[in-house]
């Protein structure tokens, strides 16, 4: 942050040891990129395997993909509405799958036990930079959804049902990404740390039930994030009368 005239203490907060990549004056958390590429590769591999030989009577990976498709379609339709949900299904589905696989990777893979020359690996969603980026992406998406569908009429949302709501609606635009990012970050980081500590202290049996609990929590967090993203988009495209 050398290009800023003042120091930002919050930006200096860190959890764990990081693998840094230096690109010019920009310092990046390299472990987030590494594990994100692994997650994206796993998702692409799943899609390739599931769609390589499509059959009328699905089974195996194709059956799983069709189940996910139906699930995400129903989620988007419920939260966004019949008229607009098709446009946002790919976005909601991508969010859900990336967060879901990232979270499960954090629960199943003891990343912190994989030694690097410097730093340590971890689930992408256990890094605040990732969750904030995802939350800001959701914010940009619902602004875009509202403006592209309604034009300047989108700003009627801020005075509905009464102009007194304007400051509250503006504050809400800041609290939405904050709550999305910190909820996901806190839950996944806590799960990773608990599993890593238990694996270190009692490496055989005790971590197993905690890992299963982590899998359940990870799936719920992915569902909550995707559902709230779809809800915010649906709220933005909703017509107020």
From Swiss-Prot:
Stretch forming the signal peptide: none
Where is it located? Answer: Cellular thylakoid membrane
Chief subcellular location equals: membrane
This entry carries the following GO cellular component terms, namely:
plasma membrane-derived thylakoid membrane; proton-transporting ATP synthase complex
Q: Which Gene3D superfamilies match?
A: ATP synthase, F0 complex, subunit A
Q: Which GO terms describe its molecular function?
A: proton-transporting ATP synthase activity, rotational mechanism
Q: Which SUPFAM superfamilies match?
A: F1F0 ATP synthase subunit A (SSF81336)
Report how it sits in the membrane.
Multi-pass membrane protein
* InterPro entries assigned: ATP_syn_F0_a_bact/chloroplast, ATP_synth_F0_asu, ATP_synth_F0_asu_AS, F0_ATP_A_sf
List membrane-spanning regions. 30-50, 91-111, 128-148, 193-213, 214-234
Q: Which PROSITE patterns match?
A: ATPASE_A
Sorted UniProt keywords: ATP synthesis, CF(0), Hydrogen ion transport, Ion transport, Membrane, Thylakoid, Transmembrane, Transmembrane helix, Transport
Quaternary arrangement and interactors, per the entry? Answer: F-type ATPases have 2 components, CF(1) - the catalytic core - and CF(0) - the membrane proton channel. CF(1) has five subunits: alpha(3), beta(3), gamma(1), delta(1), epsilon(1). CF(0) has four main subunits: a, b, b' and c.
* Family under the similarity heading: Belongs to the ATPase A chain family.
NCBIfam families (alphabetical): ATP_synt_6_or_A
The record's listing under HAMAP family reads:
ATP_synth_a_bact
Against PANTHER family, the record matches this protein to:
ATP SYNTHASE SUBUNIT A, CHLOROPLASTIC
The name this protein carries in UniProt is ATP synthase subunit a
What organism does the UniProt record list as the source? Prochlorococcus marinus (strain MIT 9303)
Which lineage is the organism of this entry classified under, starting from the top rank?
Bacteria, Bacillati, Cyanobacteriota, Cyanophyceae, Synechococcales
């Amino acid at each position: 942050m050398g290009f800023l005239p003042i120091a930002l203490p919050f930006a200096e907060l860190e959890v764990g040891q990081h693998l840094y990549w230096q690109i010019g004056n920009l310092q990046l958390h390299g472990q987030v990129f590494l594990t994100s590429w692994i997650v994206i590769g796993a998702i692409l591999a799943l899609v390739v395997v599931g769609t390589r030989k499509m059959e009328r009577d699905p089974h195996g990976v194709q059956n799983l993909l069709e189940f996910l498709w139906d699930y995400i379609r129903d989620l988007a339709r419920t939260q966004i509405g019949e008229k607009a949900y098709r446009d946002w299904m790919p976005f909601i589905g991508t969010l859900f799958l990336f967060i879901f696989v990232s979270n499960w990777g954090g629960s199943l893979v003891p990343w912190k036990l994989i030694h690097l020359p410097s730093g340590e690996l971890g689930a992408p969603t256990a890094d605040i930079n990732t969750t904030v980026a995802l939350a800001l992406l959701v914010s940009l998406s619902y602004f875009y959804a509202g403006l592209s569908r309604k034009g300047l009429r989108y700003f009627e949302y801020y005075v509905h049902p009464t102009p007194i709501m304007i400051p509250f609606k503006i504050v809400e635009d800041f609290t939405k990404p904050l709550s999305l990012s910190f909820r996901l970050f806190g839950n996944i980081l806590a799960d990773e740390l608990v599993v890593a500590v238990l694996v270190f202290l009692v490496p055989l049996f005790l971590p197993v039930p905690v890992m299963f609990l982590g899998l359940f929590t990870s799936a719920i967090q992915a569902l909550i994030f995707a559902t709230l993203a779809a809800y915010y988009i649906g709220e933005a495209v909703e017509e107020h009368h």
